[in-house]
Amino acid sequence: MHQAVKGLDKQGFVSIPSRNILLPVYNDAYSDKGLNAGANYANKSVIDPTGEHKPIMGEGNYGLAAHNFNDGQTGFSGLQQYTNHDSPYLQDGHLKGSDWLNGQKILLANAHGIYDYRITGQTLVTNKKISVLNPTQTAQVTIISCLFPSTDYRIITHGKLKNIYTWDNAPRKLVNEFNLKEKNTNAHASWWNPGVEEGANGQKGGTE
């Protein structure tokens, strides 16, 4: 797998097709370097405050974080229902959620295969609420992104695992979501973290 960023360990990719999100996944959600490169696994929880456990795609609670660039398209910006509007997540000081993405796919991919999750809802938490990353018995994905304009809060997008595929037995439609010669990646904004995209809008690389 093409490493792309020196000093970071690429885990694979995340795709949310309904929101045109395709990002590389690295191993450091707690540094500017990691977040400026794309998505990263987030693994510091109440149970594991120093992040000793390395998460595994398709197992337990796989946490992911990326920037919300408040533009509806870069990083995880597309997961906020209305750009630059706290509603429906924060209303009159009350933390709410949203079901606008329920049922949509979250796809993770690494050298072993594709992990097919379905969104079950969104909730809002403060930026200190690391319990959302606590280990779970069931396989799920927990995506963390900032709320705009109230950036002290985090939108949590929850997904449950539905299927695991090897590259050989995965449906062609799912495989195509990670075809970097045809699909654009959306990790970089010129005004914040300029860089070369890995997809058809940049290096046009493959998954090798």
Question: Where does each model-flagged region fall?
Answer:
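Solvent-exposed, non-transmembrane regions of membrane-associated and secreted proteins
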Residues: 1-208
